């Protein structure tokens, strides 16, 4: 057998094979021998069918079996002999199989790029300065007030406004005819929530209990019910009740309702502390992302499409899971699988490049994850999730893949810490990034 390896690019190799005619003949005889054991031809017992009839009826199956046997035997041996580590399935191209002649085929595969990281000290990156934002604290207190609010019936002369909860009956018509799902009684709607057709809530504003009115709207072109999309509609509405939201007063008693606080100042201090923690985590995450991007800019290289596709599929599945937790779907976000992959392909490529660079740098600088590092991380995970340390530790001991993933993440974190220690970091306002 003769083998020749072509480097088509830094990430793609083509292995050319030539199988001697003697080997081909041997495999053909072997294949017909196996076929004869099971061949059923009228007038002959199994195992007794003459070869000329086998050739006549089973030549295609013979060729398939021979190709499979030859390729399985020679392809994997060549990978080992030539030290080729593919990241993709092979693309096989072959000549027609002919008895008495040598057989040629090729296998094209993608391989990991040979990454040697350079210019990784002194990377220049910008870090956002943490700035305390009083408005964020006020907004959080407002949210807490909203969560502690209760509804009270409005007086008879109250005109509905955004934020009110209005109960009403409605009947909808398109072209003068009622439509499915276009009518309801005692329907409650928070004005300004945007839950209804655009323009509907705006026309409820200003109405009072007992008012009857006619509301005209146009269904959006992308409305879920295709038979209504883009059509004008008229709704007859009757206002039955208006409730206004009563917010608790912001004082020490309000703070005490949350259990651990004795005063409003203590509550504000806690909100500030949590906000600072979240903001600094965000700033640190974005700094690390910019650092990796700077490393990629200094060390650009080709990435196998297979690795990008794998990362894209992982990102897609994670996105679907996050949306499902919010009872949402990709379609609700205006995306399908293909559209998502087109939109986020460059992101996936950057993530793959970053991972390969960090892995290569870990080898170059002999950065390893010690048992103490892993133990400390497992303790951190247990504390964050309020779980027993033994439970979390057992999970990782019994799940090799989860432990491997955690170790890989820890190694990446250590490499990024190494880079940060040698980087030139410029703290700037957010507007300068």
Swiss-Prot record:
GO molecular function, one term: protein folding chaperone
SUPFAM superfamilies cross-referenced by the UniProt entry: FKBP-like (SSF54534), Triger factor/SurA peptide-binding domain-like (SSF109998), Trigger factor ribosome-binding domain (SSF102735)
Record field: catalytic activity: [protein]-peptidylproline (omega=180) = [protein]-peptidylproline (omega=0)
Residues in PPIase FKBP-type domain copies: 163-248
A Gene Ontology term for the protein's cellular component: cytoplasm
Role summary: Involved in protein export. Acts as a chaperone by maintaining the newly synthesized protein in an open conformation. Functions as a peptidyl-prolyl cis-trans isomerase.
Domain notes: Consists of 3 domains; the N-terminus binds the ribosome, the middle domain has PPIase activity, while the C-terminus has intrinsic chaperone activity on its own.
Protein family membership: Belongs to the FKBP-type PPIase family. Tig subfamily.
Name of the protein this chain belongs to: Trigger factor
Gene expressing this chain: tig
């Amino acid at each position: 057998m003769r083998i020749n390896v072509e480097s088509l690019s830094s990430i793609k190799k083509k292995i050319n094979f030539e199988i001697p005619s003697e080997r081909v003949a041997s495999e053909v005889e072997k294949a017909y021998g196996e076929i004869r054991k099971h061949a059923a031809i009228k007038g002959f017992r199994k195992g007794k069918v003459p070869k000329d009839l086998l050739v006549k009826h089973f030549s295609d199956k013979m060729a398939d079996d021979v190709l499979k046997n030859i390729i399985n035997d020679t392809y994997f041996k060549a990978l080992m002999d030539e030290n080729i580590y593919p990241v993709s399935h092979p693309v096989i191209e072959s000549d027609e199989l002919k008895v008495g002649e040598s057989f040629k085929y090729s296998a094209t595969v993608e391989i990991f790029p040979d990454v040697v990281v350079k210019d990784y000290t002194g990377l220049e990156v910008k870090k956002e300065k943490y700035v305390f934002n009083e408005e964020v604290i006020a907004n959080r207190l407002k949210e807490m007030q909203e969560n502690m609010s209760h509804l009270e019936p409005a007086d008879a002369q109250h005109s509905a406004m955004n934020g009110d909860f209005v109960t009403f009956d409605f009947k909808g018509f398109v072209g003068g005819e009622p439509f499915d799902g276009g009518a309801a009684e005692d329907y409650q709607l928070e004005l300004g929530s945007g839950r209804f057709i655009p323009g509907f809530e705006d026309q409820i504003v200003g109405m009072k209990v007992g008012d009857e009115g006619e509301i005209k709207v146009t269904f959006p072109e992308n409305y879920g019910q295709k038979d209504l999309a883009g059509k004008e509609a008229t709704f007859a509405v009757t206002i039955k009740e208006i409730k206004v939201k009563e917010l608790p007063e912001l004082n020490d008693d309000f703070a005490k309702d949350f259990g651990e606080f004795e005063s409003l100042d203590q509550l504000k201090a806690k909100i500030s502390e949590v906000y600072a923690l979240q903001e600094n985590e965000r700033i640190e995450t974005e700094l690390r992302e910019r650092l990796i991007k700077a490393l990629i800019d200094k060390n650009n290289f080709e990435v196998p499409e297979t690795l990008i596709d794998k990362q894209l599929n992982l990102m897609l599945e994670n996105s679907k899971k996050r949306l499902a937790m919010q009872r949402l779907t990709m379609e609700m976000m205006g995306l399908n699988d293909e559209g998502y992959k087109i939109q986020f392909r460059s992101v996936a490529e950057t993530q793959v490049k970053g991972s390969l660079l960090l892995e290569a740098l870990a080898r170059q600088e002999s950065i390893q994850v010690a048992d103490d590092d892993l133990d400390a991380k497992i303790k951190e995970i247990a504390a964050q999730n309020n779980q027993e340390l033994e439970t979390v530790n057992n999970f990782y001991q019994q799940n090799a893949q989860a432990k491997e993933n955690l170790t890989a993440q820890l190694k990446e974190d250590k490499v990024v810490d190494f880079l940060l220690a040698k980087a030139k970091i410029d703290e700037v306002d957010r507007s300068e990034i």
